[in-house]
């Protein structure tokens, strides 16, 4: 058990870290070999924890020694000298950290195992040759070894290369995961070189590189044959090398590119390295540690293979390789351009496109962007249009590598065919036999090798790959977009390439996620200006049918059902990529109801581009994620003069927010320009004061015809006040919902009251939910209701109203001029004490027909008071919802008596109440001819045959009565379904 002193010390240390430092601490923590209990803890809990909570998690899941070592080593790695000294002084026994001076795995047995004569020299000679080749092929466009620093940042998380990592009895399995092109393979190869570096290790160590791209082409073999294929000179030494497994590092590169049927990696696994097996079986045996269990493993993969890997790897350590972070990209631009102004302008252009900026984490994409924009700037061209879309940038890069009028039509067709065939086959590396099968000559590729579109493997000269996966996707889209020659296979069936409809189908994309971005690029190539640019350079023409094919596919997508949020996001992204207004008009024309979830500024831009053409749109549901707008920032004005004077001098975060607000302004114009838009829902949204004001500005305009508005769970709290202010005097508004767990401020109450008392107010439905108001505020609100003549339906569900507040409302409703017809007080913390005054309302009210008291513990006494009101001849109540109100048998007796007296009640909800035998008493009323009840909702009684039979008899005697017994617990329908 961890000592209280250690827990207190750890908490004190962690609480001194700022937000960024705590985030770094967690990242470094992940690189440590976690103990079993901590390893099973959901990492999301660790990510969300503050310093105090993180300390609690660690002391509850890890041993004292582990906590001491990990804390001191991580603080030292973060260069937090003072905190590190404090940790050593307070936490360490004997004042020492248990560090590992020798980074090797294994134990004393390793040192006693000697290599054969000549084996050591032969292995190191081979590795030195390999090292020279790898070091020359790591990065595209490297500047002053810039990428080495980025790689080293990730390399320190590899535990078997970190001398400070605590010794582990079992060997490590490390998984490097991340998107394509961010440097996973480079990092893995550098780890191999460091593992075998004679300067770092006094004993001989071995490393074997297993490329899954290559292994997919191999037939059955033994494991010894598998690893010796690249080392023929060491073939005789393989048995003695494998006998020293604790000295071996295996790198399994690109697990996601291993083409195997589901489950192939976990079938027929074996531990005999001399036995011939299919390559997937050998890899599965290695990962499951059936084969050479004492070896260290380093696996690289894209995220899509992580789920399968979890079934194979034994207690893996996951290291996310992120490539270039934002600061890396900025530094890269500065080095590439040389001129700071040009570099920062280009960098801001890339950052303005979220999709392009995300791709920029790959060094190759950063190089493409820099190369393209620098050339444009040198020519005096405006680079802004180029960065609007990824298609525009990639097309400009492609055309810039060749002179205009080069007439390379055939060569470009060949290249696009190669890209498409590879993408459909989920293949990124092409061998000579692949080229031969497609009828491609290696000489056909020379131009694109020289233009840095393709790369040739310096080790295997007959292997080719594209500069980046995204560029292969772009060229695949080009395959579909180019006009085909007479007699040419239009859809590529001869090469197992799907047609456009198949490309855009959800089924194919699930099997091959790389196809998704091809659709975006294909829309981008449907642009007329881009078609002319391509024709001017290569002499190629775009197919006149491609735009129509895209329209047909998208029409089919939402022909029979409304689009999901994800599908809509993709459609809008594709339309923006096209930059074709006419195309957007045709695609969005059928939309009448849509739901949007905005997660970044690019999505705001996509929506504003297309939805302004959606003139038949009637309902819009909007959700804005945290981070789209910045909080707690200086309130900058948006006038043009301000931006011209200060744009380059204000902080980056403010500049980014200014851009977000400009795009948001364009998006919000939809509310004042579309006369058919009647319903707006804003829910679970993180807005800012400025973004709320912009939205309200468009809502207040006379050209906005919104009738129904729902604002639910929105921040900041002041947004509710601003919306109330915007709706004052809004004639068209008939339904308003303001829900969310917020504290009412006086100004918001004033705005809401002004809205209700305004002579133009036509509000018929008002819902207030989750508000904490004082009795004085409720009194002010209910006082205003006296003067309002339009409001018919009031829902105060989930408010802290209490009996005191409810009685103030009932007092208002006993006045002869109140107009409320429907009242919901669900979950307002009411008791039987308020029901006597409510009964008086039932007696005198000529308007009230619907009443909901669900989830209030009024009990049988409360029901008694209500039934007294129901029994009066002048009572007009038709629907009464008493779901989950603590009603028992006695309450059923009161209800039965009221129903038999021919009261006006036609709908009654008693679900989620333990009425037990009270049901028999209630059934007496249901069989009485004076009972007017038509719909009764009860708790589920499927398992009670006696009650089931009783209800069937009641239905036979009263065929006009509907009894709903499917309303219990979590499956109970919402009260509002029954109430309206």
From Swiss-Prot:
ATP binds at residues 178-185. This is NACHT, LRR and PYD domains-containing protein 7. GO terms for molecular function: aspartic-type endopeptidase inhibitor activity; ATP binding; caspase binding; identical protein binding; interleukin-1 binding. The gene is NLRP7. Signal peptide: none annotated. CDD domains: Pyrin_NALPs. Residues 1-93 form the Pyrin domain. Inhibits CASP1/caspase-1-dependent IL1B secretion. It is linked to Hydatidiform mole, recurrent, 1: A disorder characterized by excessive trophoblast development that produces a growing mass of tissue inside the uterus at the beginning of a pregnancy. It leads to abnormal pregnancies with no embryo, and cystic degeneration of the chorionic villi. One of its GO terms (cellular component) is cytoplasm. Changing residue 310 to R: In HYDM1; uncertain significance. Induction: By bacterial lipopolysaccharides (LPS) and IL1B/interleukin-1 beta in peripheral blood mononuclear cells. Residues 113-123 have a biased composition (Basic and acidic residues). One of its GO terms (biological process) is negative regulation of protein processing. The keyword Nucleotide-binding applies. Directly interacts with CASP1 and IL1B. Keywords: ATP-binding, Disease variant, Leucine-rich repeat, Nucleotide-binding, Repeat. It comes from Homo sapiens. Expressed in numerous tissues including uterus and ovary, with low levels in heart and brain. Not detected in skeletal muscle. Belongs to the NLRP family. Residues 104-123 are annotated as: Disordered.
